[in-house]
């Protein structure tokens, strides 16, 4: 289905708005993928806050022009799905995890912090824990000494309570 000029401008504006707030873009080839698989991928992306879209490459090139992601333009060839996220690792994680399950999704490239990433670098980025995971680990590490101290104090209080009960 071809788009008229106004529709194309609207698509470019929508993508440019997503790109303006994004930290990461991941580009994956999707030849021969079944509709049910693409639906699962879209649902997973939505859960993780990743904007996932199949676009005409010329429209995608226009949307990323004059942004830190402009270096990806050379990689925009063939049938591609674009994962765009504000979280530095979410798009890479969603597409990389799905590519492990469905071999019809092939990661081509990505861009983070103005640098174009290859397939191996996108996989590395996907292996990094998300910000929320890191914060929960940090909180656990900070709480561990406090909860340990609380258990020790409770055990001491319990022991003193037993000692007083025996003396009475």
Curated annotation (Swiss-Prot):
GO biological process: translation
GO molecular function, one term: large ribosomal subunit rRNA binding
Membrane-spanning parts: none
Gene3D superfamilies according to UniProt: 3.30.70.1730, 6.10.250.290
Keywords carried by this UniProt record: Ribonucleoprotein, Ribosomal protein, RNA-binding, rRNA-binding
GO cellular component: ribonucleoprotein complex; ribosome
HAMAP family listed in its UniProt record: Ribosomal_uL10
Job of this protein: Forms part of the ribosomal stalk, playing a central role in the interaction of the ribosome with GTP-bound translation factors.
Subunit structure of this chain's protein: Part of the ribosomal stalk of the 50S ribosomal subunit. The N-terminus interacts with L11 and the large rRNA to form the base of the stalk. The C-terminus forms an elongated spine to which L12 dimers bind in a sequential fashion forming a multimeric L10(L12)X complex.
Stored PANTHER family: 39S RIBOSOMAL PROTEIN L10, MITOCHONDRIAL (PTHR11560)
Family listed: Belongs to the universal ribosomal protein uL10 family.
Matching NCBIfam families: PRK00099.1-1
Protein name: Large ribosomal subunit protein uL10
Originating species: Laribacter hongkongensis (strain HLHK9)
């Amino acid at each position: 289905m071809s788009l008229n000029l106004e529709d194309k401008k609207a698509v470019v504006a929508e993508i440019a708005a997503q790109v303006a707030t994004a930290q990461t873009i991941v580009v994956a080839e999707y030849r021969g993928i079944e509709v049910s698989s693409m639906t699962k991928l879209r649902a997973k992306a939505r859960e993780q806050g990743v904007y996932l879209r199949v676009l005409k490459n010329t429209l995608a090139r226009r949307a990323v022009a004059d942004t830190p992601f402009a270096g990806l333009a050379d990689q925009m060839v063939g049938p591609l799905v674009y994962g765009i996220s504000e979280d530095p690792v979410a798009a890479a994680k969603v597409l990389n995890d799905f590519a492990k399950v469905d071999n019809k999704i092939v990661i081509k490239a990505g861009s983070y912090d103005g640098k174009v990433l290859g397939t191996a670098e996108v996989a590395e980025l996907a292996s990094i824990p998300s910000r929320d995971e890191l914060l929960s680990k940090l909180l656990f590490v900070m709480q561990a000494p406090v909860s340990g101290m609380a258990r020790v104090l409770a055990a001491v209080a319990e022991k003193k309570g037993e000692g007083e009960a025996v003396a009475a």
